[in-house]
């Protein structure tokens, strides 16, 4: 696909209108048609955006860049964040495990659908930690449901339980938005998760510090 360049600006996509309100997600020119290129000024202080599906004028752009640059979330590939894809239970477990500093995990979990082996150790440890600390439980008997989506209501509860575990503010002022949305049973996308995570970190005043494991732990600064 052709991506234009302009010095000092970032390309945000193709649009069908001059006001740049109707973005074209698929462009196939079969006749005379006018399209418009969207641009925003580059921020020389910001890290490079590796994702081809996250644009500078997206509402969630700053949230995605924050969680990516801080190591709280990664893409589903080196160049794809999949902002509109539902977040999964396994991905949520990994996020909160990372935020806690990826602590050492002892013992095993009882889930029959979370395997320990090459390429799955990180997820296994995250799920085991989430279960042992009461952050997340089973979804169906002895199954964790790692690929199952997460609802807004469930994610709000996970944020609350995590805040309790870590001694953070559990009042409405300290929690991420989400529990006050009308569709609590609706599933949460990866972009919405990034937004809620960014809000939570800022509302709680959390800062990255080096954990004993060598990972980064997010906690309130000590005076």
Language-model region placement:
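Feature responds to low-complexity, polar/acidic, surface-exposed segments characteristic
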Residues: 40-59, 74-124, 132-190, 199-223
């Amino acid at each position: 696909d052709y991506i234009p360049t302009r010095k000092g600006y970032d390309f945000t996509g193709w649009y069908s209108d001059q006001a740049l309100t109707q973005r074209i997600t698929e462009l196939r020119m079969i006749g005379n048609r006018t399209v418009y290129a969207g641009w925003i000024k580059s921020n020389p202080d910001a890290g490079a955006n590796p994702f081809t599906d996250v644009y500078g004028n997206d509402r969630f752009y700053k949230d995605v860049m924050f969680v990516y640059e801080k190591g709280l979330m990664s893409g589903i590939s080196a160049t794809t964040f999949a902002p509109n894809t539902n977040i999964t239970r396994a991905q949520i477990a990994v996020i909160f495990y990372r935020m806690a500093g990826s602590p050492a995990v002892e013992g095993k979990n009882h889930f029959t659908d979370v395997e320990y082996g090459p390429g799955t150790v990180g997820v296994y440890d995250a799920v085991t930690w989430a279960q042992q600390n009461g952050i997340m439980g089973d979804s169906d008997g002895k199954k964790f449901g790692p690929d199952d989506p997460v609802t807004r209501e469930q994610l709000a509860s996970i944020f609350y339980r995590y805040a309790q575990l870590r001694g953070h503010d559990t009042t409405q002022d300290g929690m991420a938005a989400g529990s006050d949305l009308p569709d609590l049973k609706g599933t949460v996308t990866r972009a919405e998760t990034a937004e809620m995570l960014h809000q939570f970190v800022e509302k709680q005043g959390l800062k990255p510090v080096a954990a004993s494991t060598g990972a980064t732990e997010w906690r309130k600064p000590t005076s």
